[in-house]
């Protein structure tokens, strides 16, 4: 199958925007809880739609009073917490455009986003974040930024007080300012080269996709459903699901620190969660290690095999009686305990950001947690395709959501069209033009469609590394910084589907003798000996540390290995134009790479 298009389930009027989702929920007699926050006692307290609307409007009035104009850009730099969504919707109620910033970003990264977007203000979480923003503003002498409001300080109170004089009519006019075709947010994404590009996502992208997404996933997103958000809201995946929950009247709680995730799952008891494959890997590995430590390793492995076999049989449409009996037994011995660790009520999980793999998909389905894997990019407001409870094929990323279309180009590239696709790249009509072919967005990924319209991802056209936690990393930025030192010949950053970033480094055989002499080391030291010498290792570590200052913590190189033989054209690791053949390096040095990840503490 070359292409598939799925018609919309929900038609949305053109003069609608994201604020209408909140207003609609607040007008319902049921007044559903849209968010839950931890009170002083540690108990979860619901925030109803009417209460959320009131809080959002109070902050929006403050933004208007502070001089934020329709269409102005306002940044948000914070961990995943209630105030993130409060600020996001307040920006929309004021007719402005929100610009997410990862809270781990360096001042240089923040400076680029603030200056490129022309942000007039920024919401930040803490004094630490405020310092980064102020350093960024000073770094590039950014004059547009007039305000910084801190969640942990009195930023929101300042806005509420400032907004007392803003009348209802002004707010109402601002709220109605944007239609479906207007920009709601600019999300900066890691390009293959150069600076991050700002993806312009419209109110239509969010509203049409969330309305149709909720209609396609009624078992998951509905009034009374509860989820706990722990992925960064700066990432389009978590952000979109947050808006989808408002559209569906589901309740969202937040865990800013993943260390608290397990206790929070147990106290909040979500009905569905949103995660990246790394989370499912951790749940599986922790359960296995716990079983092995308790002398029950055999039970775990047997139970895992039964879960996978049961899921495969269930998907094929027939479960043999013997397997049913074994499955029921392990449900009591093992599966129930894993579900209880996740709060006991989780029935569905939505997975994206990186491939899950069908083994984990079948394992979780087999223990009673249906993992719905989807696929998308920042440029497609997250999901182009997703598996749904009614239409699921484990090992694929599902069929297109209603309103979306997928085509496979002649070279295998996945092309996308529909309500999910961005307007373009901010200030970059040249890049926008390159990103589309005949009206179809070029994803840069390679895949195939089966006869039922389910998409499978088979490879990446681009070189961007996606870690197991879904973080996009541009290898060239780090590699170039490390290669800048004469002692280094080549550097290959590793980390695709891995828990962290590492690097393979080779030494420059011509530069080595001079370096040895300067450091009073024996001239006869071979490259292989130098690769293990403490002085050389210390020098490379210093280079790595310096390179790491240009990126966020999640993108930083945690471990490196010096490889004794250089990567050259003769060894088959360089092209004639001296470009690294990554796949060949990873293949030839797979044992080194495996040793990095098997010995390192995650």
Feature roles, as predicted:
Residues 46-50, 184-210:
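Conserved AMP-binding A3 loop
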């Amino acid at each position: 199958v070359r292409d598939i298009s799925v018609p919309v389930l929900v038609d949305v009027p053109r003069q609608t925007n994201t604020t209408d989702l909140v207003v609609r929920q607040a007008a319902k007699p049921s007044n559903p809880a849209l968010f839950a926050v931890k009170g002083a006692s540690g108990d979860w307290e619901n925030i109803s739609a009417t209460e959320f609307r009131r809080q959002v409007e109070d902050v929006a009035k403050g933004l208007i009073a502070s001089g934020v104009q329709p269409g102005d850009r306002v940044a948000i730099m914070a961990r995943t917490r209630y105030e993130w969504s409060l600020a996001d919707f307040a920006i929309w109620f004021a007719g402005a455009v929100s610009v997410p910033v990862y809270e781990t970003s360096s001042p240089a990264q923040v400076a680029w986003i603030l200056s490129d977007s022309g942000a007039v203000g920024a919401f930040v979480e803490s004094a630490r974040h405020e310092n980064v923003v102020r350093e960024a503003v000073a770094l590039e002498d950014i004059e547009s930024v007039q305000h910084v409001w801190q969640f942990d300080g009195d930023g929101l109170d300042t806005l509420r007080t400032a907004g007392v004089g803003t009348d209802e009519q002004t707010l109402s006019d601002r709220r109605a300012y944007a239609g479906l075709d207007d920009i709601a947010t600019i999300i900066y994404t890691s390009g293959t080269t150069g600076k991050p590009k700002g993806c312009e996502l419209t109110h239509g992208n969010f509203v049409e996709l969330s309305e149709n997404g909720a209609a396609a996933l009624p078992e998951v997103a509905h009034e009374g459903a509860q989820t706990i958000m722990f992925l960064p809201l700066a990432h389009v995946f978590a952000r979109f699901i947050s808006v989808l929950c408002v559209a569906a009247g589901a309740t969202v709680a937040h865990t800013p620190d993943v260390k608290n995730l397990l206790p929070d799952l147990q106290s909040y008891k979500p009905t569905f969660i949103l995660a990246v494959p790394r989370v499912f890997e951790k749940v599986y590995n922790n359960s296995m290690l716990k079983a092995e430590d308790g002398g029950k390793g055999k039970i775990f492995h047997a139970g895992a095999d039964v879960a996978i076999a049961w899921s495969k049989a269930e998907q094929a449409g027939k479960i043999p009686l013997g397997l049913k009996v074994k499955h029921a037994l392990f449900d009591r011995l093992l599966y129930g305990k894993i579900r209880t660790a996740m709060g006991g009520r989780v029935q569905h999980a939505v997975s994206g950001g990186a491939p899950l793999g069908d083994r984990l998909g079948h394992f979780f389905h087999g223990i009673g947690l249906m993992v719905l894997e989807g696929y998308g990019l920042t440029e497609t407001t997250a999901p182009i395709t997703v598996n749904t409870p009614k239409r699921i094929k484990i090992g694929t990323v599902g069929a297109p959501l209603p309103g979306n279309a997928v085509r496979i180009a002649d070279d295998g590239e996945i092309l996308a069209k529909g309500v999910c696709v961005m307007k373009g790249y901010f200030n970059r009509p040249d890049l926008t033009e390159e990103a589309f072919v005949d009206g179809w967005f070029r994803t840069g990924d390679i895949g195939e469609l089966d006869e039922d319209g389910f998409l499978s991802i088979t490879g990446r056209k681009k070189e961007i590394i996606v870690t197991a936690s879904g973080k996009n990393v541009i290898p060239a930025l780090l590699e170039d910084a490390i290669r800048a030192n004469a002692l280094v010949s080549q550097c290959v950053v590793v980390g695709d589907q891995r828990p962290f970033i590492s690097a393979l480094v080779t030494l420059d055989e011509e530069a080595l003798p001079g370096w040895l002499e300067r450091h009073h080391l024996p001239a006869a030291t071979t490259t292989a000996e130098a690769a293990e010498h403490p002085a050389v290792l210390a020098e490379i570590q210093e280079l790595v540390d310096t390179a790491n200052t240009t990126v966020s913590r999640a993108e930083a190189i945690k471990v490196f290995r010096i490889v004794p033989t250089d990567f050259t054209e003769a060894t088959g690791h360089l092209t004639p134009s001296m470009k690294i053949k990554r796949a060949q390096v990873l293949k030839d040095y797979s044992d080194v790479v495996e040793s990095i990840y098997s010995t390192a503490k995650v």
